[in-house]
């Protein structure tokens, strides 16, 4: 799994464990993708949105995905929508869709961030931030992962009061540094060296 999938699954499971009713809307083509029927069942909290291209970097939704998303949100009537932003054109439509059905929208902005790099990767990251900033400013809240990231988004027009920093964006009780040193740890460390 990529980080987005792990993040989505762990967030969903944690909310379910706390007694919240969760619906999961994600990109996944059903076997009969040419069908014009809705991609959900009446009582099913999970919805599959059709796509044309899907990778770990971006997703191109099918032409009917936006309609499916709107119908799903109207049917599910959520109290709140959380979007794990996946570099998809639908990310930019979410603020308007949620506003139309009067549902608060929170997003987690996953694109990588490195304030120090000055290379092609950093330029691509900067372009992604510039493209997303106007849309992120329309979300009710945006989850990000660091203070430097917050500063960049604020400079690009995303109000600081809409940004919430969750370091690493993970459950720190599960994902934490290994602290118990033992013989196997020392063997691995000796093989890899102290810089790793």
Predicted regions and their residues:
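N-terminal subdomain of nucleotide-sugar transferases
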Residues: 1-31, 101-103
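Carbohydrate-associated surface elements
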Residues: 28, 148, 169
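A short, charged, and often flexible helix/loop element on the N-terminal side
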Residues: 36-71, 83, 124
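An aromatic- and histidine-rich active-site surface loop
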Residues: 80-103, 107-114
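A short helix->loop->beta-strand "cap" motif at the edges of active sites that frequently abuts
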Residues: 101-105, 139, 160-162
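Nucleotide-sugar donor phosphate/pyrophosphate-binding loop at the beta->alpha transition
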Residues: 104-106, 114-138, 180
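A short beta-strand/loop micro-motif in the catalytic core of glycosyltransferases
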Residues: 138-146, 164
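A short helix/loop element that forms part of the nucleotide-sugar donor recognition site in Leloir-type
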Residues: 176-193
């Amino acid at each position: 799994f990529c980080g987005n999938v792990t993040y989505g699954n762990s967030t969903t499971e944690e909310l379910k464990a706390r007694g919240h009713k969760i619906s999961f809307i994600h990109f996944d083509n059903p076997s009969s993708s040419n069908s014009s029927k809705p991609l959900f069942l009446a009582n099913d909290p999970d919805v599959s949105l059709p796509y044309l291209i899907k990778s770990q970097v971006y997703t191109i939704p099918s032409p009917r995905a936006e309609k499916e998303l709107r119908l799903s949100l109207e049917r599910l009537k959520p109290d709140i929508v959380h979007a794990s932003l996946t570099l998809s054109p639908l990310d930019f439509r979410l603020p308007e869709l949620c506003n139309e059905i009067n549902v608060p929208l929170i997003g987690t902005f996953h694109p990588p961030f490195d304030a120090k790099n000055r290379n092609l990767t950093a330029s691509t990251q900067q372009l992604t931030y510039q493209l997303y900033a106007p849309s992120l400013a329309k979300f009710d809240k945006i989850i990000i992962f660091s203070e430097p990231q917050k500063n960049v988004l604020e400079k690009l027009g995303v109000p600081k009061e809409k940004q919430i920093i969750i370091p690493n964006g993970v459950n720190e009780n599960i994902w934490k540094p290994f602290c118990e040193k033992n013989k196997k740890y020392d063997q691995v460390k000796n093989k890899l060296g102290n810089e790793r």
